[in-house]
Amino acid sequence: MRDGMRPLGVVLPVYNEGSVPADLVGRMPAIVDRVFVVDDGSTDDGPDLAERAGAEVIRHGSRRGAGAAIRSGLFAARDRGMAAVVVMAGNGKDDPTEVPHVVAPLDEGYDYVQGSRFLRGGSFRNLPRSRHLLIKAYTVAFRLLTGFAASDVTNGFRAYRVSLLSDPRIKLDQQWLDGYELEYYLHYKAVTLPYRVLEVPVSKNYPSGKRDYSKMRPIIDWWHGVRPVLFLALRIRD
């Protein structure tokens, strides 16, 4: 990564993830200038451990939602003068050593980079079959609505030019985006506005034999991911 996209920030949204965020902070590659851990109302000591590991911790007084946490991290990166920002899972499913690979296209002129476990060179482990099928179905629907040849729309490992966040057509500061909606809203905007978007292969590793591999609730939270795409496509929201 050239100095043109420095400084680089990484956002880790967390909710009761124990020592995992601190471990992720310690494994960040040298190109990462700041790590923003957004504590969305955790009741454990995970955010304190992450702070001691060197992260800047942004604390929500109560649980506000995944979108609210990501928004807080993105806005913090912008306000601290980051040129580029990566969002990745705070629960250990994403590999910090892949950050240079994910941000590299920004140096080539891309504005937004989407990680994909399904591209050649990507991988996934312990992905529940039911979730795999839902991801594939959602991705097909997204492709039909946007015309963008996506392969893994739900993957939260992403990189952005921070300047994208100041586009007045991208209105992240809307309360209805506080849940999982924000990620899909931003993805839809990036691929339908005149931005350069690229998918790159990444790995995604789910814990073996762990039932709570995700905070997402079946049906309810999947609807939260679907509705921003429908609302934007039908021009119900902007």
Which residues does each predicted region cover?
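Short beta-strand/loop segment that forms part of the nucleotide-sugar
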Residues: 12, 24-25, 33-42, 58
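A conserved acidic beta->alpha catalytic loop
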Residues: 39-47, 92
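Acceptor/aglycone-binding surface of glycosyltransferases and processive sugar-polymer synthases
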Residues: 61-79, 96-180, 206-216, 220-226
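N-proximal low-complexity "stem/linker" segments adjacent to membrane-targeting elements
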Residues: 1-27
